[in-house]
């Protein structure tokens, strides 16, 4: 391969339900480190002006929190209409940024703050997925899904980390799309 990276993560997740169909999750601590163990050829990155591509191949520290909500009224072993809704919101870098600005300043010649010598990401990301199954009779159903999201980098970051970007495509189609 042209590069190698190691992904390390740690976190605490609280999950609960308040009804038969609704569930929640909260990750107050969500830490990820993307370590470029074998960086990309500098000549390759030097030939592009795409900041998103360049930042995708940097070592990054991602520390934040996330919240998720799920609603699913499909019953096992029963036919019938069903609705599935998933909402997620995630923010990273804000607590680190507040501490950095209060007590430190960026190293000379650098515009970005670091933690443990690694630039940290600062962004907000949210997404929503809604799917619906309508039984038309017997073993026939009409099924649809809508999915969308928004991600925005700010503060200490000029782009959202590659692992948090949205993309189109999959294993069977639309492979030509890029993040």
PLM region spans:
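Solvent-exposed loop/turn segments connecting transmembrane beta-strands
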Residues: 2-6, 96
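C-terminal structured domain segments across diverse proteins
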Residues: 2-3, 14-16
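C-terminal outer-membrane beta-barrel translocator/porin domains of Gram-negative envelope proteins
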Residues: 11-13, 21-179
């Amino acid at each position: 391969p042209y590069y190698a990276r190691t992904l390390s993560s740690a976190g605490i997740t609280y999950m609960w339900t308040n009804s038969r169909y609704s569930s929640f999750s909260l990750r107050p601590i969500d830490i990820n480190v993307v370590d470029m163990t074998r960086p990309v050829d500098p000549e390759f990155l030097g030939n592009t002006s795409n900041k998103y591509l360049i930042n995708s191949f940097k070592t990054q520290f991602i520390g934040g929190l996330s919240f998720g909500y799920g609603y699913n009224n499909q019953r096992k072993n029963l036919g019938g209409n069903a609705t599935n809704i998933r909402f997620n919101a995630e923010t990273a870098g804000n607590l680190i940024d507040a501490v950095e600005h209060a007590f430190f300043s960026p190293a000379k010649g650098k515009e970005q703050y670091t933690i443990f010598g690694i630039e940290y990401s600062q962004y907000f990301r949210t997404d929503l997925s809604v799917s619906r199954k309508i039984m038309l009779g017997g073993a026939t159903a009409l099924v649809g899904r809508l999915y969308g999201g928004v991600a925005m980098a700010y503060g200490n970051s000029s782009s959202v980390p590659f692992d948090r970007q949205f993309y189109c495509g999959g294993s069977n189609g639309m492979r030509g799309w890029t993040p």
